Every structure is written in structure tokens, then in C-alpha cells.
């Protein structure tokens, strides 16, 4: 079991380490490069990854309904448990709760799912990523920007390239229209490039980790996988998941906070320095939390 877990996580954290090392060597110049990389991922490669994963012939959306319901339960339970913890610790819930709910199921979760459960796991992992992003851009924004913006503003955030690529992919998954295979393969090649590039970009972001606001960062790094795994146990008790689905759900639940939490905190000026600490310390602590989730998931 230990060897299998190491075989899964070492390549992922290896690419993150390469990104971190590259950022250290490049210095301040790396920020503009990372910005261009993120724009490329968000506007082209990420949408193509979502489209090709969902439109693939072996992806059946109806079969993934229990897994998606499980992911929604994990997100909901995480928020419900994190809220009183934030109050007890003296944190602003708008700062602390969203990073506990919305995890790094994109640039860390996708490659981990493929390495742990094989290429067939990419479609379900993308579906959970899409669900999490949709809730993040709607419910998550409402929590962070409580009282600042109307509902229609947060709904407009859903009209981004990632969501558009997802919508087209879902339409293909339902209707199954004819599509030239060579063209699909070309789009898939581009989409697959998104995964290592997201890991590399995450490594670049790690250079911003500092000791500032360490208390909320450390507490968040502990609470995030704990409440997530609690949600996974609740979902597992309520839903009829197969072995692979159960494994993917526990992996999803153990992931650290998404980097998107920091971006939204900056946009809405909701203590972004504290959210940055939660996000970055949490991703560093994933070296411990992800193997725990994998062990629980692979045990099935």
C-alpha cells in the first residue's frame, strides 16, 4: 500500500517541486511568466481538458450521478463543520470557510486521480472539478462577498471559458453527435497538457509562502482534510458507490484548498493575505493529507 501511494504522489509533488525550483531561479521575472501560463490554462487548455474528458466515448454522465452527489455532500459538510470552527477560533467565516469547502481538485486532484485509478478516472475527476467550480463561482462568491454584490454578478462569473467548455462537453456527453476523431485527438492533446502545466504553476505559487498569518494557515491545513474526510464518510454511508467511485471520493475529500480561493479573496478584498496563508500552507501540508485520503480510498 505504501509503495502504491508513493508511486501516485511522488510524480505530482515532483512536478510541483520543479515549478518551485524554477521560480527560485528566475526570481521576480517568473511572475509575468506564471501569469501568462495561468491565462493559457484558464482560457484554452483547461476548457479543452473539460470538453474532451466529458465528451469522450467512455464517459457516461448518468453513471457518475452518485459520485457527483458525494462530492456535493463533501463540500456541504465541510462548510457546515468549518463554520463553527471559524467562530471558535476567532476567524472571519468569510475568510476561513470557503477554502475548507472548495479544494484543489483541478491542478492537484486531476493528475492524482489518473495516477491512482487510471485514465478512465479522468472523466469523473473532471466532473467533480466542474461541480466544485460551479459551486465556487456561485455559492462560494456569495459567502466571500456577502452583502457586496448581487446574485447576478456571481452568476456572470460562470460565463467563463472553463464553464463554456464544460457545457459543450456535457452537451456532447448527452447527445453524442458525430465528431471527427482526428480533430478530437488534437483537442485532447492540447487539453492533456493542462495537467502538468497546472502542477508547474502551483509550484511557482509556493514561493509566496511566508510565516505571516501562520496560525490561520496551520489551523486551515489541519481542518480542511479533516472536515473533507468527514464529509466523505457521510457520503459513503448515504450513497451506493462502487470501489473506484469510493476511492475517488476519498481522494477528492483529502485535497488541500484551491488556489482560486486566494484569487477571489483578492477580488473582494476579504483578508487575501490570510486566505493566501490558508491556501499555500494547506498545499504544503498535502504531503501528509493526500496519502491519508489515498489510503482510505485504496483500501476499498
What are these regions (language model features)?
Residues 1-300:
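Alpha-helical transmembrane segments of multi-pass small-molecule/ion transporters
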Amino acid at each position: 500500500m505504501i509503495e502504491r501511494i508513493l508511486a501516485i504522489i511522488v510524480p505530482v509533488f515532483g512536478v510541483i517541486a520543479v515549478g518551485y525550483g524554477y521560480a527560485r531561479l528566475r526570481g521576480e521575472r517568473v511572475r509575468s511568466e506564471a501569469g501568462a501560463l495561468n491565462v493559457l490554462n484558464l482560457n484554452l487548455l483547461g476548457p479543452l481538458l473539460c470538453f474532451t474528458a466529458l465528451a469522450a466515448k467512455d464517459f457516461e454522465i448518468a453513471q457518475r450521478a452518485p459520485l457527483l452527489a458525494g462530492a456535493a455532500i463533501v463540500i456541504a459538510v465541510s462548510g457546515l463543520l468549518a463554520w463553527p470552527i471559524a467562530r471558535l477560533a476567532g476567524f472571519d467565516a468569510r475568510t476561513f470557510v470557503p477554502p475548507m469547502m472548495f479544494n484543489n481538485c483541478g491542478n492537484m486532484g486531476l493528475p492524482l486521480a489518473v495516477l491512482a485509478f487510471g485514465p478512465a478516472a479522468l472523466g469523473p475527476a473532471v466532473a467533480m472539478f466542474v461541480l466544485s467550480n460551479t459551486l465556487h463561482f456561485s455559492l462560494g462568491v456569495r459567502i466571500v462577498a456577502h452583502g457586496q454584490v448581487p446574485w447576478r454578478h456571481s452568476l456572470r462569473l460562470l460565463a467563463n471559458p472553463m464553464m463554456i467548455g464544460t457545457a459543450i462537453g456535457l452537451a456532447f456527453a448527452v447527445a453524442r453527435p458525430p465528431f471527427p476523431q482526428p480533430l478530437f485527438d488534437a483537442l485532447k492533446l492540447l487539453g492533456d497538457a493542462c495537467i502538468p502545466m497546472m502542477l508547474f504553476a502551483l509550484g511557482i505559487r509556493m514561493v509566496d509562502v511566508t510565516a505571516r498569518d501562520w496560525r490561520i494557515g496551520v489551523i486551515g491545513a489541519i481542518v480542511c482534510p479533516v472536515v473533507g474526510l468527514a464529509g466523505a464518510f457521510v457520503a459513503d454511508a448515504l450513497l451506493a458507490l462502487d470501489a473506484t467511485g469510493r476511492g475517488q471520493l476519498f481522494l477528492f475529500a483529502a485535497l488541500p484548498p484551491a488556489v482560486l480561493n486566494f484569487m477571489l479573496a483578492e477580488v473582494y478584498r476579504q483578508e487575501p493575505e490570510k486566505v493566501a496563508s490558508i491556501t499555500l500552507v494547506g498545499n504544503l501540508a498535502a504531503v501528509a493529507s493526500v496519502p491519508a485520503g489515498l489510503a482510505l480510498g485504496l483500501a476499498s
